[in-house]
Curated annotation (Swiss-Prot):
Residues annotated as catalytic: K203 (schiff-base intermediate with substrate)
Protein name: 3-hydroxy-5-phosphonooxypentane-2,4-dione thiolase
Record-linked Pfam families: DeoC
Catalyzed reactions: dihydroxyacetone phosphate + acetyl-CoA = 3-hydroxy-2,4-dioxopentyl phosphate + CoA
Length: 291
């Protein structure tokens, strides 16, 4: 400990210069606690307020589907090219190296399979475990217009409440009821309900008509799901249109890991999301990287 006689008076106090408090500019997040903003700043690049997530949580209801048979062989080489990893805690602990040093969005809903009703989910992760795993957000499905709509909304409310206690963001993932049309009206409804409940991020689907309304009507960031595997040019066009119409990023799985050149695909998506490249330029980048 320094002696009292050795303490020197400070001189440069910047008197007359107001203290700098840079605003947290991510959509709808300016009033959140410091810890939650810090986690969101790891998910969304503060320079662009956008993100490229790599989703490989499909096994929680699909099992070892194509491309996810061996996470350590097929997916691990992609980690460094994604901004964020989205997975289950089982895969995180068993396969993902801590040294990968990538933010994680942790799948926190489950208890179903493709053999039953997909909408009948429960909260599958305690918030304390998400904190223990150093996750940057938890994610759960919300199924508007299904038999289990009420339970799915209760699930995200539970995660949101617990997340507020621990500074952990919640990403609500909009599912689709069997009798619901995948259109702007449905996804606007589902996204807005989840945001109104307090979700800090919404993951939803891109639609060809009216997506800009979905994005504009949602008060928090929207990231789009990649959905089923598309030809690379089509997937990049979808990505470009979503970003151009107000999405804050993408959370792609099958359109990455089922591609013949997944690293090239990730680089092309990154160029659209963070460098504002159009789909044609991104596809040329994909072809170049593929070769």
């Amino acid at each position: 400990m320094a002696d009292l006689d050795d303490i020197k008076d400070g001189k440069d106090f910047g008197i007359g210069i107001p203290q700098q408090n840079p605003a947290f500019t991510l959509k709808g997040s300016g009033s959140l606690d410091w810890g939650m903003q810090s986690r969101l700043a790891r998910i969304f690049n503060p320079k662009t307020n956008r993100t490229v997530m790599l989703a490989f949580d499909h096994g929680y209801f699909q099992g070892p589907t194509t491309g996810l048979e061996r996470i350590d062989i097929n997916i691990a080489p992609l980690f460094e090219y994604a901004d964020v990893l989205m997975c289950t805690r089982g895969i995180l602990r068993s396969v993902v190296p801590a040294a990968a040093n990538r933010p994680v969005v942790l799948r926190a809903s489950g208890a179903n399979s493709i053999l039953t009703y997909l909408s009948n989910e429960a909260v599958a992760v305690a918030m304390e475990d998400a904190v223990r795993l150093n996750a940057c957000a938890v994610a759960a499905q919300v199924y508007i217009g299904t038999e289990h709509e009420h339970q799915s909304i209760k699930n995200i409310i539970q995660l949101i409440d617990q997340g507020m206690r621990y500074g952990m963001p919640t990403m609500a993932v909009t599912g689709v009821g069997k009798d619901m049309v995948r259109d702007q009206r449905y996804f606007s409804l589902a996204s807005r309900i989840a945001a109104e409940m307090g979700a800090q991020v919404i993951k939803t689907y891109y639609v060809d008509s009216g997506f800009e309304r979905i994005a504009a009507g949602c008060p928090v960031p929207i990231v789009i799901a990649g959905g089923k595997k598309l030809p690379e040019r089509d997937a990049l066009e979808m990505c470009y249109q979503a970003i151009d119409q107000g999405a804050s990023g993408v959370d792609m799985g099958r359109n990455i890991f089922q591609s013949d050149a997944p690293i090239a695909m990730l680089k092309a998506v990154h160029a659209i999301v963070h460098k504002n490249e159009n789909a044609a330029a991104a596809y040329q980048l994909f072809l170049h990287e593929q070769n």
